[in-house]
Amino acid sequence: MSESRWKGALLVAGTTSDAGKSVLVAGLCRMLARRGVRVAPFKAQNMSNNSVVTLDGGEIGRAQALQAAACGLEPSVRFNPVLLKPGSDRTSQLVVRGRAVTSVGARDYIEHRQHLRAVVAEELASLRADYDVVICEGAGSPAEINLRATDLANMGLARAAGLPVIVVGDIDRGGVLAHLFGTVAVLGPDDQALIAGFVINKFRGDVSLLGPGLEQLTAVTGRPTLGVIPFAEDLWLDAEDSLGVVGDAPVGRPAPPIGDDWLRVAAIRLPRISNSTDVEALACEPGVSVRWITDPSRLQDTDLIVLPGSKSTVSDLEWLRRNGIADAIAAHAKRGGPVLGVCGGYQMLGSVIVDDVESGRGAVPGLGLLDLEVEFAPDKVLAQVRGNAHGVPVSGYEIHHGRVRRNGDQPLLHASSGAAEGSIRGAVYGTHWHGLLETDRFRRLLLDDVAEHAGRTGFVTAPDTDVAAIRTAQLDLLADLVEQNLDLRALEDLLGAGAPEGLPAIASTLVS
């Protein structure tokens, strides 16, 4: 197969959220990049509180940053021009080309759609001019036909740009054949004409047993299944959104300890959690068991409590108090137990939060575990950052409205500018920096300190855990799965020629 023939663009849509769109796009991007193809990812609109900061100080969804890494590219706002960050069940912060614009509800958003449609079209056209291949990711499911009129990321994008569409479904959830058929059937004929085939994700067992079902799916839809991706336990880093963060569930695949003791970490699963991926670096370490927790009783036998970031800091702080987790954290800290707060979680650990921006609550008492006062400002801090923590070079990124107006504790680290960052008081640690735990030497120092405070004298940190290498290995595994299990000739043809002419329309009473 001639590598030079890989040219064009396609859209990966899904039967549901968390069906496998993000990982399939990452796998396709990695597979093409390994073949020397100039490839870029694109998600017109993402709804997620897991985000990263680009080199130019913009903000995009973390999944698109991972997909960029799969392509061998730095994150760019071009790859995710519209980002919605939910702050409540009814409102989201609207981020356009990396910058927060306003807070919108569902009805308010309609007012912005024409402008956003133009932004999306411009960015996609620019990427198609600069790269051989652009792999686009849909949002949620195109089957949400109540949203079709305002759709920017699914069939609205495919129709506007003439993109062939592959629909991926998660067989691990059950009912995948019905999901795939139904996704096509509820669409209008013009949308259906762009649906070129299916991919089944997370299959376990003998794939030949699926054959009769796939034959029937082709018979009733007129479209082939282009591949069946097997379930892979080793793929767990960089969850796209909060759907991957399940309360009272383990993070990753814990490896046995090197020494005699495990280190048990409880990460609080906040209702408006953001950048939950911060704790994944801890779960990469042998002998470190990380679980998401929503029940205060589960904190009684933990060694380290982690309060992650939040898109609604004051609201999530009130949730901690209502369900008893705040009291459990205080009791743990009183016993000398280690606590780590990151970004919004760091702000919660302080004495007071003054918030006239997100919640409008004014001065709100924090948990009081750090001598810290934070005040929210309308403009958001967005920056990639570097510094030094106790002789160890560190890096990360900042995404927050809160400004420290007083810090009476020792700093956790110093930024490269010399400015103090974060706090340490006994075994309570806090920082505004996301991604700090991905610095391997710093993470080992922190875990050694946590083990000492927790009395886990038999815990031994691994000397060679490399989070960046683990992430790279997962991207290569994704590419291997794509290469081994998808019809690459059919994908190449779709990229070059678009959806085949004459695909049948499935009659439906739901659409005209």
Swiss-Prot record:
GO terms for biological process: cobalamin biosynthetic process. Keywords: Cobalamin biosynthesis, Glutamine amidotransferase. CDD domains: CobQ_N (cd05389), GATase1_CobQ (cd01750). Gene3D superfamilies: 3.40.50.880, P-loop containing nucleotide triphosphate hydrolases (3.40.50.300). Residues 262-442 form the GATase cobBQ-type domain. GO terms for molecular function: ABC-type vitamin B12 transporter activity; catalytic activity. Catalyzes amidations at positions B, D, E, and G on adenosylcobyrinic A,C-diamide. NH(2) groups are provided by glutamine, and one molecule of ATP is hydrogenolyzed for each amidation. NCBIfam families: cobQ, PRK00784.1. Belongs to the CobB/CobQ family. CobQ subfamily. This is Cobyric acid synthase.
